Amino acid sequence: PFDIPEPYVWDESFRVFYDNLDDEHKGLFKGVFNCAADMSSAGNLKHLIDVTTTHFRNEEAMMDAAKYENVVPHKQMHKDFLAKLGGLKAPLDQGTIDYAKDWLVQHIKTTDFKYKGKL
């Protein structure tokens, strides 16, 4: 597995080379960071769910348009993560924050990196 950056911010090692997706990934990092900074904030959790939903929709639309071969399992990973987020309520616990941090890092560097140059 890939290391979790500390502080938890996007850096160049996460670049997928599609500016819109890189910008959205930065927003996901910020969303998780904000939830970690104030685990009692329902607003931060809602914001994270909203930006994640929007990003997944945009990324999946690009994969569909490009007829990307791994779109089905990729969409399932998105669906599973959103289901997990949707089941959460503030206050969050450290285990949940750690899960979200790790999921995002591993997903981008393992799964998203497979579509580099293919969308």
UniProtKB/Swiss-Prot annotation:
Keywords: Iron, Metal-binding, Muscle protein, Oxygen transport, Transport
Gene3D superfamilies assigned to the protein according to its UniProt record, in alphabetical order: Hemerythrin-like
Keyword Transport in record: yes
Entry coiled-coil feature ranges: none
Residues where Fe cation 2 binds: 58-59, 74, 78, 107, 112
Tissue: Muscle.
Cross-referenced CDD domains: Hemerythrin
Binding site for Fe cation 1: 25, 55, 58-59, 112
PROSITE patterns: HEMERYTHRINS
Molecular-function GO terms, alphabetical: iron ion binding; oxygen carrier activity
InterPro entries registered for this protein in UniProt: Haemerythrin, Haemerythrin_Fe_BS, Hemerythrin, Hemerythrin-like, Hemerythrin-like_sf, Hemerythrin_metal-bd
Pfam families the record matches: Hemerythrin (PF01814)
Function: Myohemerythrin is an oxygen-binding protein found in the retractor muscles of certain worms. The oxygen-binding site contains two iron atoms.
Subunit composition and interactions: Monomer.
Recorded family membership: Belongs to the hemerythrin family.
Protein name stated in the entry: Myohemerythrin-1
Organism annotation: Phascolopsis gouldii (Peanut worm)
